[in-house]
Swiss-Prot record:
The keyword Cell wall biogenesis/degradation applies. This is Phospho-N-acetylmuramoyl-pentapeptide-transferase. Its main location: membrane. It comes from Neisseria gonorrhoeae (strain ATCC 700825 / FA 1090). The gene is mraY. The keyword Phosphoprotein does not apply. NCBIfam families: mraY.
Length: 360
């Protein structure tokens, strides 16, 4: 919204700063951060008053039983902060902004309904897996179709392999949709599985979103993208504003979600943030880079799939408990140790992902 102020730069030279993506990206992060910090206490009080307490699973780590009753659905604060900040600092004429907000709010609505069922019916399992998959699939397919037909040229419909500049595989509409589906739905569920300890998901989301913001900014500038041999995606630079808004909103939320957590983000936050990260990766054609930078999310999801699959086949477990962060808790790691060590791993992975900008 503030972008329109740049049109009056002839009257007041200082207003010209609003046309710069970098300035608006920084301001989007600060706005979302301030929003989360300002409305965080009110959100916690409101969720507590509405008795939106988390029903802790009895088959989980026994140390988590003390968390029973902690307000959940705090992700609604994150989503509101991202939406407000993006609308204030983003370019409303950019279709990617609306696709990202649509994915964020649509999957957020699913998460909200899931959390609401858990709160009202005291059912830790929430909505059925089938219902959740149908909803997520619908959002992913619609977003994938929109992004495919927005592509300006065939370079926007290729599969980029990190570290190899000569490998770029054409996808076509079916391949593009399949890859978009796997990226959006997979990341949504992976982030949701990661959100099992205080602060475990929030900060890695900040790190990955920051990394993707750099890719978005570079991909949206023809000279930069050509120099780094990345596909040029016209308008992708505005996606960086959405990403930095996500960073600010999650950092502000982390203030209240840090151990011992005053509030949990719930599915309303985790499902939406994961889907948004996946959509950004599809826009900038960096699905494999997302796998690298979001390696923590991948490992968490794979640990669950391996555990379930192996148990169904052999009636034995690979891990003491899944997702894998609970495995390390069962081995004697303190919750804070697991969280900080997983943060460190994510920092390293994001740096490796960023190295693909130049190492080819």
């Amino acid at each position: 919204m503030f972008l329109w102020l740049a049109h009056f730069s002839n009257w007041l030279t200082g207003l010209n700063i609003f046309q710069y993506t970098t300035f608006r990206a920084v301001m989007a992060a600060l706005t979302a951060l301030a929003f989360s910090l300002m409305f965080g206490p009110w959100t916690i009080r409101r969720l507590t008053a509405l008795k939106c307490g988390q029903a802790v699973r009895t088959d989980g780590p026994q140390t988590h039983l003390v968390k029973n009753g902690t307000p959940t659905m705090g992700g609604s604060l994150i989503l509101t902060a991202i939406t407000v900040s993006t609308l204030l600092w983003g370019n409303w004429a950019n279709p990617y902004i609306w696709i990202l907000l649509g994915v964020l709010l649509a999957t957020g609505a699913l998460g909200f309904y899931d959390d609401w069922r858990k709160v009202v019916y005291k059912d830790p399992n929430g909505v059925s897996a089938k219902f959740k998959m149908v909803w997520q699939s619908s959002v992913a397919v619609i977003a994938g179709l929109a992004l495919f037909y927005l592509a300006a040229n065939s370079a926007n419909n290729i599969l980029i392999v990190p570290f190899f500049k000569q490998i770029a595989l054409p996808l076509g509409v079916v391949g593009f949709l399949v890859l978009s589906y796997l990226t959006i739905v997979g990341t949504s569920n992976a982030v949701n599985l990661t959100d099992g300890l205080d602060g475990l998901a929030a900060f890695p989301v900040v790190l990955v979103a920051a990394g993707l913001a750099i890719f978005a900014y570079v991909s949206g500038h023809y000279q930069f993208s050509q120099y780094l041999q990345l596909p040029y995606v016209a308008g992708a630079n505005e996606v960086a504003i959405f990403c930095t808004a996500m960073c600010g909103a999650c950092l502000g939320f982390l203030w209240f979600n840090a151990y011992p957590a005053q509030v949990f983000m719930g599915d309303v936050g985790a499902l939406a943030l994961g889907a948004a990260l996946g959509t950004v990766a599809v826009i900038v054609r960096q699905e494999f880079v997302l796998v690298i930078m979001g390696g923590l999310f991948v490992v968490e999801a794979v640990s669950v799939m391996l555990q379930v699959g192996w148990y169904k086949k052999t009636k034995k477990r690979i891990f003491l408990m899944a997702p894998i962060h609970h495995h390390y808790e069962q081995k004697g790691w303190k919750e804070t140790q697991v969280v900080v060590r997983f943060w460190i791993i994510t920092i390293v992975l994001v740096l490796i992902g960023l190295s693909t900008l130049k190492i080819r």
